[in-house]
A protein has these predicted regions:
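Short coil/turn linking the two alpha-helices of tandem helical-hairpin repeats
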Residues: 122-131, 173, 194-206, 454-457
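C-terminal substrate/ligand-recognition segments
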Residues: 331-470
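Conserved, well-structured interaction surfaces
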Residues: 12-13, 17-30, 52-127, 143-157, ...
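Alpha-helical solenoid repeat scaffolds, predominantly canonical TPR units
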Residues: 86, 154, 161, 211-214, ...
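An aromatic- and glycine-enriched ligand-binding surface/loop that stacks and positions planar moieties
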Residues: 1-53, 163, 185-188, 193-382
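Long, intrinsically disordered, low-complexity segments
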Residues: 67, 80-83, 157-159, 240-311, ...
Length: 563
């Protein structure tokens, strides 16, 4: 209304609620569900590479031409600071709000504290020691001098905020239908994650041990209080990412929500596109057509926004005993047309099969395509098309230069979306509605294990027990004993292997490699298609737009390697 000011609007409970809700909006509207974070956080590491090793988003995923002027670098910076600014505005005003329900004040205080810590964790890990802002800012106030803050000060604020979230957030969201709100389990998880990351900025072992204790205590609390916190592991890997469990996922500790009602999303016709970003090309091959079961492979071509697993990632799994691989990756496509398919010369040539197979028939429901991590003998003479690991990748792990084979690979299934079929939308629709799980319970087990491995006087038997808790859940039925590992495996490198098997594609890998100081080592060892990797890539550049807007850009400075 005319004459309204933020102070007047936010003093009313309805206005304040709108401010709190706005702090959530960008997580789905800009980050978790969109391509930038896929490129920034799944890309740039050892587990994923652009489909066909193409150049889409190469600045983020392969560090090619990564400069301070790249749009995604600017947008990520701006949106994270906007979230922080909303949180600062709310935290500054919360005690002036006329709440009808007094307990709501503490809950919203916890949510704003959680959101600010979560945003700063992303911001600091992506860009380094940036400007610490705890007061609401305007464009005018930022057109002045800005100064870098120390990692100590930045992490002190994050840890304080995370602890405030722990102290104030309820077990259930408030109101209970708002499943995307931060709750107690999310607060403990964030405290554990932030404290573990804080270790990487410590000089002495004694200082590291201080933060290992905070991280382990928070993670172990979640493990010990699953019933009270309303979180638990599914019995099998297949259940974790079953689309039927997406909106009520019992293993999720924090989710970024996307509504099945398009108009409720920040970008109504463009909400969650994750279902498009990990598919291999299958339609129009060997008689296959695009359908709901196998998903939208529109992006599965060179030059598009899609990611394929590295050879290293695929070879981390022993699918004979580890059920995660077949639960979370698709290799086989069965003919999905009502009529049989007869092989044609052009399709035989495409898959390098003998012309003598012209006219041979694949019946509906029979295997038409197999894109596999295995090596298949006599693969060209099988009645269906085979692209095996040696077709898709070279021996050194790089992506094949064959345009016929480098768009065919095992497809990640963690983001399959039932919204299209449920709504009767076309199979090539982009409008996904899945929630994106950004924190899952197994992370707490890995944090406890890592702390016991790395802290002074740690107990590797405890680490082994926590890792085996997750590996037993991951086992093929009857293979639980074979999946268990011994104390000799309790190293940081094994933790990173196990995190890769459990969390591939879930936006964690770049953070994990950076936190452990392994980014350059692992990329050089396992992803030869990122030859430009350098130590300074553990930070992205400070946006030129920001430096141009302040009075002391030289004093603030660009991150090393980007001048």
């Amino acid at each position: 209304p005319a004459g309204s000011t933020p102070d007047n609007v936010y003093k009313e409970q309805a206005g304040f609620e709108a401010l709190v809700n706005s702090a959530y909006a960008f997580w789905g509207g800009q980050f978790y569900g969109r391509e930038d974070f896929v490129l920034l956080l799944n890309g740039g590491g050892d587990l994923w590479i652009n489909i066909a090793n193409c150049g889409y988003g190469r600045q983020m995923s392969k560090y090619e031409e990564l400069t301070a002027s790249v749009g995604q670098i600017k947008n990520t910076w701006n949106r994270l600071y906007e979230i922080i600014n909303d949180c600062n505005a709310g935290l500054e005003r919360i005690d002036q709000v006329e709440f009808k329900d007094k307990k709501l004040r503490d809950i919203r205080f916890g949510e704003l504290s959680f959101m600010r810590a979560y945003a700063y964790w992303h911001l600091v890990e992506i860009y380094g020691n940036v400007d610490l802002r705890t007061k609401e800012t305007s464009a005018e106030s930022l057109s002045m001098n800005c100064y870098r803050s120390s990692y100590e000060d930045l992490y002190d604020l994050m840890l304080t905020d995370a602890q405030n979230a722990v102290d104030n957030l309820p077990v259930d969201p408030y109101p209970v239908k708002d499943v995307g709100r931060a709750t107690s389990k999310a607060a403990y998880g964030l405290l554990a994650r932030i404290a573990l990351t804080r270790v990487s900025y410590c000089d002495s072992q004694a200082d590291k041990d201080k933060y290992y204790k905070i991280a382990e205590d928070a993670a172990q609390y979640v493990i010990d209080n699953q019933s009270a916190l309303k979180v638990s592991l599914y019995n099998t890997p297949a259940e974790v990412f079953d689309p039927d469990n997406n909106k009520t996922n019992k293993e999720a500790m924090f989710v970024v929500t996307h509504s099945t009602e398009s108009s409720l999303n920040m970008q109504a016709k463009n909400p969650n596109r994750m279902h498009m970003y990990f598919h291999a090309s299958y339609s129009a091959r060997a008689g296959m057509v695009q359908d709901y079961e196998y998903g939208n492979d529109k992006n599965a071509k060179s030059g598009s926004m899609a990611m394929m697993p590295t050879r290293y990632l695929l070879e981390l799994y022993n699918e004979n005993i580890d059920a995660r691989y077949n639960a979370w990756f698709r290799e086989e496509y069965k003919l999905n047309t009502p009529k049989a398919y007869a092989w044609t010369k052009d399709q035989l040539d495409y898959f390098e099969k003998p012309s003598s197979m012209i006219g041979q028939v694949i019946q509906p429901g029979e295997t038409a395509l197999l894109f596999t991590k295995k090596k298949i003998a006599d693969k060209r003479n099988l009645p269906y098309a085979v692209v095996d690991i040696d077709d898709t990748y070279a021996a050194d792990g790089s992506v094949s230069k064959s345009a016929n084979f480098n768009i065919h690979f095992p497809t990640l299934l963690k983001y399959e979306d039932a919204n299209f079929e449920n709504k009767g939308l076309p199979t090539n629709s982009q409008v996904g509605a899945n929630d994106v799980i950004t924190m899952r319970l197994p992370e707490m087990y890995f944090i406890v294990a890592e702390c016991e491995i790395m802290k002074s006087g740690g107990n590797k038997e405890i680490a082994k027990a926590r890792i085996n808790d997750i590996r037993r859940r991951a086992a093929v039925p009857g293979k639980e004993a074979e999946m268990e590992v011994g104390v000799d495996k309790m190293t940081i490198d094994f933790i990173l292997e196990e995190r890769a098997r459990e969390y591939c594609g879930e936006f964690m890998r770049w953070f994990d490699l950076k936190r452990t100081g392994k980014l350059v080592e692992y990329v050089k060892a396992h992803n030869p298609d990122i030859p430009l990797i350098q130590p300074h890539h553990a930070w992205r550049p400070i946006p030129q737009m920001f430096l141009d807007s302040i009075l002391n850009p030289d004093e603030f400075g660009q991150n090393e390697g980007y001048n």
